[in-house]
Structures are given as structure tokens and as C-alpha cells.
Amino acid sequence: MDSQYFLAFSLSLLLIFSQISSFSFSVDPTRITQLSWTPRAFLYKGFLSDEECDHLIKLAKGKLEKSMVVADVDSGESEDSEVRTSSGMFLTKRQDDIVANVEAKLAAWTFLPEENGEALQILHYENGQKYDPHFDYFYDKKALELGGHRIATVLMYLSNVTKGGETVFPNWKGKTPQLKDDSWSKCAKQGYAVKPRKGDALLFFNLHLNGTTDPNSLHGSCPVIEGEKWSATRWIHVRSFGKKKLVCVDDHESCQEWADAGECEKNPMYMVGSETSLGFCRKSCKAC
């Protein structure tokens, strides 16, 4: 590995470990499968218990509204669209003990701080409902100010689906084709796909390791053919979500030391950032 990329990765880990929740959760590596490198995707079988799944669904019932999509990249305003036909709602962060534990488990598994995550979104798909392929990263200025790009997405399946409802990655690139029998929907055969199974969680990254957006992360929710689908989504940003970065600050106590060592020039993506994603040491690098 090139030394500058190794150092950037090490700096990232330092930042992450300094912010992760103290909640104790043992990640079971025997339940985790790496599905793909393009995009980087992982499946954690049995991440949520049946009780956790049922509780999240119960919190959402009676509060669901038609799902929306972003319509204006400048304002971030949303609109109704046939691209996305599910219904959903957002919980509040740490709404109760179970929600707080789920959020802490997500931080422990992903090694990404709790504060970087949006509130959990609960989604319900009935017969024929779907979400066409889309990206979870974005370029609207309002969203970027609230935490930068969504570095990762975690989809947690809260119910089993008789048929359909798979998560599909149309731009997936792999050496070995994924074999699919008649139990898979036609939509799922358009790329690499994951069947929704109650309790399982799918983690995939929307950005490359160097911080640039990954077009291979294009994904969609296939139409439900039989049954219904419940899921919970956790979008995780590159920095604390909801705090506008309008002041010139460093996001790590070692920024000045790294800047003095020349890291502003050696690792500009991490230290300074780009037009669409702010770096972590802009003040020390005199970028603002």
C-alpha cells in the first residue's frame, strides 16, 4: 500500500476510535460475509433480534407517510415520485432504549461514530412497491453542510418477504457471476442482489477509500411480488450529522501536528477535502 494512503487510513481510524460510543456490543465475525469489493458491501446475518425488528415496526405503524425523493440539488427540497413508491417515517435518535442500542450496535459494527448517523428511517413496501436504482451520496449544498457525503448505508431487514423486495446493485462488478434460481425476482437478476431476511443487515459504502463517490454503489429496492417488506435504514455521514460546518475548525486534536509534518500536501483529501466534501483539518492547513 502506498505510504500516503496508509497514513490517511491510519488518521481516519484514530478519529473514528476516538469518537465511537462506549456501548458494549460484541461483533460476531462468523455472521459477517463480504459480498463485494465493487461496491464494498457486507452482510451481517442476525444483526437484529426478532424483538428489535418487531419493536421498530411497532414504533412506525400509524405514522407512515409517502416516501419522497430529493428534487432540487440546491435547496435539498423533496417531492413525490414514482421512482420511490414506499411509505416511511423517521424515528428520533435514541428514541428509547431499544433504538439507542440499535444505534450503538451500528457504530460498533461499522466503526463509524453514532453522531455521524441520521435518525433511523423505517420503510414499508407493499405489493408492487419499490425504489428504483439510485445513489445515496448527493451534491445538494444543504445536505453537504449537515455532515458531508453519506459515506455508508446500512439496510436492516425487519421482516421476511415471500418474493421480491431484494436489494439490487446494477453496477456491481465481480469476477464470479451470482447464480440465481426462480426464487429471485426479474429485477434482482439485473445485478448483484440480496434477499431481505428478518434480522439481517446490509452495509455498503457510497464512497471510495480516497473519499470520492463510488458509482458502483448504485442500488435499488426491487418490487415486492408477494408479502410485504419492512426495513430500517441508517445513513452515515463523513462527519457529525446536523451540525453545519460554517466555521473554520479542525475535527481532530492532532491536526496541527499532522499539518506541521506536511500532511496537508501529502493527504489533501483527508486533511483539506474537496469542493463537495470538507476535510478534517482545514484550519491547520489554512484552507479556510
Curated annotation (Swiss-Prot):
Pfam families: 2OG-FeII_Oxy_3
GO MF: iron ion binding; L-ascorbic acid binding; procollagen-proline 4-dioxygenase activity
Cofactor(s) in the UniProt record: Fe(2+); L-ascorbate
InterPro entries associated with the record: Oxoglu/Fe-dep_dioxygenase_dom, P4HA-like, Pro_4_hyd_alph, Pro_4_hyd_alph_FE2OG_OXY, ShKT_dom
Domain called ShKT: residue spans: 248-288
Gene3D superfamilies: q2cbj1_9rhob like domain (2.60.120.620)
Free-text cofactor note: Binds 1 Fe(2+) ion per subunit.
Assigned keywords, A-Z: Dioxygenase, Disulfide bond, Endoplasmic reticulum, Glycoprotein, Iron, Membrane, Metal-binding, Oxidoreductase, Signal-anchor, Transmembrane, Transmembrane helix
Residues glycosylated per entry: N160, N210
Catalytic activity, as annotated: L-prolyl-[collagen] + 2-oxoglutarate + O2 = trans-4-hydroxy-L-prolyl-[collagen] + succinate + CO2
Residues that coordinate or bind Fe cation: H134, D136, H219
Topology of this chain in the membrane: Single-pass type II membrane protein
Disulphide-bridged cysteine pairs: C248-C288, C255-C281, C264-C285
Residue ranges of the TM segments: 5-27
Record topology, Cytoplasmic segments: 1-4
GO cellular component: endoplasmic reticulum membrane
EC number: 1.14.11.2
Residue ranges of domain Fe2OG dioxygenase in the record: 116-238
Binding sites annotated in the UniProt record for 2-oxoglutarate: K229
Compartment(s): Endoplasmic reticulum membrane
Lumenal membrane side: 28-288
Main location: endoplasmic reticulum
Function according to Swiss-Prot or TrEMBL: Catalyzes the post-translational formation of 4-hydroxyproline in -Xaa-Pro-Gly- sequences in proline-rich peptide sequences of plant glycoproteins and other proteins. Hydroxyprolines are important constituent of many plant cell wall glycoproteins such as extensins, hydroxyproline-rich glycoproteins, lectins and arabinogalactan proteins.
Family: Belongs to the P4HA family.
Listed name of the protein: Probable prolyl 4-hydroxylase 6
